[in-house]
């Protein structure tokens, strides 16, 4: 689409929601895109998303046990997203630390001053990560584990991308991240690793048309393109490394790249309750 210019405005998820809400009476935004499905439930509940169901073929109904698209048709999944931990191999070696495998590992006192996370009040993906822990372990046990993990933090970043930046640079050794932060850092050549812990979930990253979008036709074309084979393949770019929702795209993925359509263990432990998460947003 060489004649269509796309302007992207990057905001924290919470700030993006607030912006759409505050400008709804004179809306100038066509699309909202985020990794956290609960954010779309907030906008849908406010009547700020327009229905659109793409006719692009090849996209299954589910990724893991979670619907790829909103059953009511207000937003569309274009990538899958899991949550876990990334680490800097050089940092861990220099500090004689093991790579973590489960959330509880990050509560070990050996990691004191060596870990980081972004603020869940400012990052939609971090909110979802904490919510996953609460839903997977139960509210009381989950918060207990999260508090013990937080006791080891060297820093809490204001933006979610501050965590991979800190791990990649060696400012701290281990960070709690959405999967594509770790996978894209690996793809870009940083000396890092990434793991999905057992208690994690798998949900779609979504995109939706805003109510009264000034360029509604082109907004729908953009969603369609994201779902085409060409659009899905872009997700495999080393600087992006998101999980496509078209299973056929994985034939072009690098070796050892996660494939949720073949590895049923990714996100199997937690069936994410988006309404519960929305209520605690």
Question: Language-model segments: which ranges?
Answer:
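Ligand-binding "clamshell"
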Residues: 43-51, 70-72, 184-196
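C-terminal capping/gating helix-and-loop segments adjacent to ligand/active sites or protein-protein/ligand interfaces
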Residues: 238-244, 248, 253-281
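A bilobed periplasmic-binding-protein/Venus flytrap-type ligand-binding module shared by bacterial periplasmic
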Residues: 86-91, 202-217, 234-235
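A structural signal for short loop-to-beta-strand junctions that line the ligand-binding cleft
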Residues: 27-32, 50-87, 104, 113-114
